[in-house]
Design a protein with these regions (language model features):
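Von Willebrand factor type D
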Residues: 2-242
Length: 242
């Protein structure tokens, strides 16, 4: 099943998000910058956006190129590798833990289990370009690397060229044990008292306020709405995952 059908909790395409409340919205961010998607006391997830600037609309067309997941003292990278020409048989998903590449056999159901972090695993859900990353009791992230098709680029003026097929990530998220104060572009929708301020009746509801979600880097936890506490997370994390 495509991850974009695993609602709620997705970020797909020019990124549209489906929150925990079931509402879908766009958050465009800015190309070559990182934004916090989920920020909680013991978990922080940033997305780095890639894209092209569209002169007619005056904004960037953006997609999620990589995720930076911080928990305890660990940094997990899940990214899409750039390709001039898309080959569905070639793997474009890159996963690394604390800077060390995760090596997965090129076969469906191939599985890697971390020796450093108890409960952390990566499983291929296809021979290439699709993985599920799970930290038991905390999160499951399903990531597919996908290109922009010639047809999509023509219809939406995305600006795909022969030098770049705009490979990006479509992502589905499942979380366990988030606190009531969780924040971030997607994370806020998991609050028990969350009330959407989006114009849901609009054809393309857009979440603004990019500045408060902007992070200084893929693994930075310094966005204005950050709830992550590194020391508390590192101290408490050993009880469930390391």
């Amino acid at each position: 099943m495509p991850v974009c059908d695993l609602i709620p909790g997705t970020s797909c395409g020019d990124p549209r998000f489906t929150g925990a409340d079931g509402n879908t919205f766009y958050f465009h961010g800015k190309k070559d910058e990182s934004f916090c998607l989920v920020s909680d006391e013991q978990l922080h997830i940033n997305a780095r956006f890639m894209g092209n600037h569209n002169a007619e609309s005056g904004r960037d067309f953006t997609w999620v190129q990589a995720l930076g997941v911080t928990f305890g003292g660990h940094k997990l990278y899940v990214g899409a590798r750039r390709a001039a020409e898309w080959d569905e048989d070639e793997d474009h998903v890159v996963v690394a833990l604390d800077g060390e590449p995760v090596d997965l056999e090129p076969a469906r159901n191939a599985r890697w289990v971390s020796k450093a972090v108890r409960g952390l695993s990566v499983t291929r859900t296809a021979d290439a370009n699709a993985v599920t990353v799970e930290l038991a009791g905390v999160f499951t992230i399903s990531a597919n690397a996908v290109p922009i098709t010639d047809e999509d680029s023509r219809v939406h003026s995305y600006g795909k060229t022969e030098r770049d097929s705009l490979v990006h990530l479509d992502v589905g998220y499942q979380f366990h044990g988030l606190t009531a104060g969780v924040d971030g572009v997607l994370g806020q929708t998991y609050r028990p008292n969350y009330v959407s301020k989006l114009d849901i009746a609009a054809k393309m509801p857009v979440m603004g306020g990019a500045d408060k979600y902007r992070s200084s880097g893929l693994f930075a936890t310094d966005c204005a709405v950050s709830r992550f506490h590194r020391s508390a997370a590192a101290d408490g994390y050993t009880s469930f995952a390391s």
